[in-house]
Amino acid sequence: MIPQLLQRSSRACPRYNPALYRLSTTSQQRPGLTQTFWTSAPRREQPRTPTDSKPTTTKPSAVFPANKKATKQNDPLVTVEKSAPEQRKADWAIMKEMTRYLWPKDDWGTKLRVSLAVSLLIGAKVLNVQVPFYFKSIVDSMNIDVAAVGGTATTVAGAMILAYGASRIGATVFQELRNAVFASVAQNAIRKVACNVFDHLLRLDLTFHLSKQTGGLTRALDRGTKGISFILSSMVFHVLPTALEISMVCGILTYNYGAKFAALTVLTMVSYTAFTIWTTAWRTKFRRQANAADNKASTVAVDSLINYEAVKYFNNEKFEVARYDKALGQYEKNSIKVATSLALLNSGQNIIFSSALTGMMYLAANGVAEGTLTVGDLVMVNQLVFQLSVPLNFLGSVYRELRQSLLDMETLFNLQKVNANIKEKAGAKPLVLSKGGEIKFENVNFAYHPNRPILRDLSLTIPAGKKVAVVGPSGCGKSTLLRLLFRSYDVQGGRVLIDDQDIRDVDLESLRRSIGVVPQDTPLFNDTVEHNIRYGSINATHEEVVAVAKRAHVHNTIQSFPDGYETKVGERGLMISGGEKQRLAVSRILLKDPPLLFFDEATSALDTHTEQALMMNINSILRERGRTSVFVAHRLRTIFDSDLIIVLKEGHVAEMGTHRELIDRDGVYAELWSAQETMFGEDGKEKSEEENDEQKKN
């Protein structure tokens, strides 16, 4: 009995032992609950096998799609084949959306620039059409024996030559001025659309971002923004002006040279346009497939580079290169189809135009032979037809590029159409902490997948201003509590309250501003140490940054860096250690200074000495400011002094109380504590099986 009391006393009054913080290598020998609990290594919640009791779930599909087909249909980055009417409807919707940026309601500066650009464009087209007339006059004027009449080129055709040159120069000047005037309109639209999409992406919930790969997303954004400028310029400078120029040329040919020229011109226009539209529509699927392959290749490359260390640790460079080569091979295959179909389109367009040009020249030459037309008329017809070739070829290429840009922008606008599962109620009021930050989970049910519930009718209360620990085996729902509290996900049954306010009824920004999180896997930006700390409060001064760094016991470490607080931490903070990253995360949260704090294995990467000093500082801050704090922990030594310890098991509360109460209860927590307490000897070495058996006998 006495040895048992001594052992019970030891569990209730823990002694500091550095060996207790080492990673256990014998955990696999421990059955049941203790098997998954003794490591402080990075963990993921694995949903447990469902039992007979199933919680009521309201919208499980909002968290995890029911099937792959639904996922593909709802993914804005996935290529979905459309019928011709559906594609036209989508294209017109994009064009309509772009008119908002081309002709904004209250932006008179943009309207003025667009109007001026259109005026310059019309002027350029009118001057272009004048050029063949002047050329005809020059040829007819020179089609005499100039020496016989005692004249010179200047006296015979000087005025026409000057007019010819002035028209060409004027058309070029007007066209370049038009480009300069319109540049600000296009760039402003690109900026607005890109910012709108980026803002929308940041507002989407965690479900969307966990299911998307960064490489494909950034590639789609890049292509879409590049297409904006072309679509805007096409709407203003290509489609309508080209149609205007074609109409003017056709009208001149008809008026000056009769019905035969008119009929041939109309036939050419109809054939050329129909062939271009049909062939381009047929080519669209190849371009869409090439875009999808491009997204995949970009995703593979970014994913491999982000996880560079994992690639090196497992010597999988060849495997990653093979993956990338496979993705590029698919892109190559689809790009060849695009290039081949483009060659077919260009060939067909040239055949149609060359046939029309041949017919026109025959009719004009026949008119000269009959004496009804002059040589100047022959030249003018040739010039007009060639002048017609420019807008025709341009219209063909514009249509091709327009289709490409519309496809790219379709993905961009599809991203804007993605609805967030987490929505703020209309008229939601800011969160008011009238009780100091009391948190309640009432009959909460939640599952990431409909068939794998995580929380089952969970009810618990976290008192205001207290330090509360949440412990339990991996997959029991500890980190899920934070995600629900932060509204990264919504509960599927029950409710979450903060000071008696349902978090679904309060303003999202005020809710998230009131919660501070120190995650186990600390997210850092590829920027300076100071920037990463200041991210907790963007307007903080350098002195405030240094102050919180000192409280987090990381100031001296930062001072030892090559550039101190200006040292770059690298991609995702990979240039500093895990412990340094966690202390920067603690500094960041101290700078934010929210009323509710959540620490998710926040010291798992620290050595015991630093961890102990840091926890003393954190505890003093919590007591001093009366903050409500929640600590998720596997190592019970770090949370035994909590005001309340909540033990989760299989999605519900197994027991709760103080450390001493739970030890006296001799339940799940006592089993966990005993396993960790007895795993190491006083010398810091793992106990042998004989030593453990001897202790059990006592």
From Swiss-Prot:
Residue ranges of every copy of the ABC transporter domain listed in the record: 439-675
UniProt-listed PROSITE patterns: ABC_TM1F, ABC_TRANSPORTER_1, ABC_TRANSPORTER_2
GO molecular function, one term: ATP hydrolysis activity
InterPro entries referenced in this protein's UniProt entry, alphabetically: AAA+_ATPase (IPR003593), ABC1_TM_dom (IPR011527), ABC1_TM_sf (IPR036640), ABC_transporter-like_ATP-bd (IPR003439), ABC_transporter-like_CS (IPR017871), P-loop_NTPase (IPR027417), Type_1_exporter (IPR039421)
Annotated keywords: ATP-binding, Membrane, Mitochondrion, Mitochondrion inner membrane, Nucleotide-binding, Transit peptide, Translocase, Transmembrane, Transmembrane helix, Transport
Annotated binding of ATP, by residue: 448, 472-483
A Gene Ontology cellular-component term: mitochondrial inner membrane
EC number: 7.-.-.-
Cell compartments where the protein resides: Mitochondrion inner membrane
Domain spans labelled ABC transmembrane type-1: 114-404
Ranges annotated as biased composition (Low complexity): 48-61
Protein name according to UniProt: Iron-sulfur clusters transporter ATM1, mitochondrial
The organism of origin for this protein: Gibberella zeae (strain ATCC MYA-4620 / CBS 123657 / FGSC 9075 / NRRL 31084 / PH-1)
Gene: ATM1
